[in-house]
A protein has these predicted regions:
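A short, conserved alpha-helix within the catalytic core of class I
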Residues: 135-137, 144-146, 165-183
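A short acidic, Gly/Pro-enriched loop at the edge of an enzyme's catalytic core
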Residues: 146-157
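Conserved beta-strand signature within the Rossmann-like core of class I S-adenosyl-L-methionine
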Residues: 156, 175-195
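Active-site flanking residues adjacent to catalytic metal/cofactor-binding acidic residues
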Residues: 114, 159-160, 189
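Rossmann-like AdoMet
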Residues: 1-91, 95-138, 151-152
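Short, catalytically relevant binding-site loops at active-site mouths
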Residues: 140-143, 163-165, 193-196
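A short beta-strand submotif of the Rossmann-like class I SAM-dependent methyltransferase core
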Residues: 155-160, 171
């Protein structure tokens, strides 16, 4: 049975990056491959007709490449961090339906996927947490979720396209608080902030 995502919901925001990763996987398989995105598109009940119609245009092709390059860059940084901190916490902020944490799994790290409760509800249906993985429903600005993170082996935070929705001061406050989790913290963020 397919998972229904309605138009004009927070859950609908999952579609754009997921579809971009699928399109890039199809158009440029030697550059980028996201089997999870390809599979998930088939498991979601959503009207993709407009996305499909637009997906072959130059701007959409460029956008899908941009998403893929961003994901590859973040994955490279996470894997590099794990070389020196193999038992670290890998924390995907605003995870949506992204599987970057899993693709970086070294067999001993702990993976935490954080997003709003309604997004985590979708994720739990389509991408249930695996071994050493936890899907945490939360508001990133409410740092009570820190208590659920085991950062004793270090922590690498990554966020892709999340901070467009944050004020500059909110990002500054979060980064300052993250430093309290572990002395060995790394941030891999796309920091184009949407609101001042």
């Amino acid at each position: 049975m397919k998972y229904k995502i309605e138009k004009n919901t927070v859950q609908e925001t999952l579609i754009i990056p997921l579809y971009a990763r699928k399109v890039c996987s199809e158009l440029y398989p030697n550059l980028y491959r996201d089997e999870t995105a390809v599979r998930l598109i088939d498991e979601i009940d959503y009207d993709f007709s407009e996305a499909e119609k637009n997906s072959r245009g130059l701007m959409q092709r460029f956008g899908s490449l941009e998403v893929a390059v961003r994901q590859n860059d973040l994955a490279f940084e996470v894997r590099d961090y794990l070389k020196g901190h193999p038992n670290a916490a890998v924390i995907n902020l605003g995870c949506g339906l992204d599987s970057t944490g899993r693709s970086c799994d070294n067999g001993s790290c702990k993976i935490y996927n954080l997003d709003f409760p309604d997004v985590i509800a979708v994720r739990n249906e389509l991408l249930p947490a695996g071994e050493r993985e936890e899907n945490i429903p939360c508001d990133l600005n409410n740092t009570e979720w820190f208590a659920k993170i085991d950062a004793s082996g270090g922590a690498v935070f990554f966020a892709s396209g999340v901070f467009y929705y944050f004020l500059t001061e909110q990002v500054r406050t979060l980064v300052q608080r993250w430093r309290t989790l572990s002395p060995a913290v790394c941030w891999c963020l796309t920091l184009r902030i949407g609101r001042r």
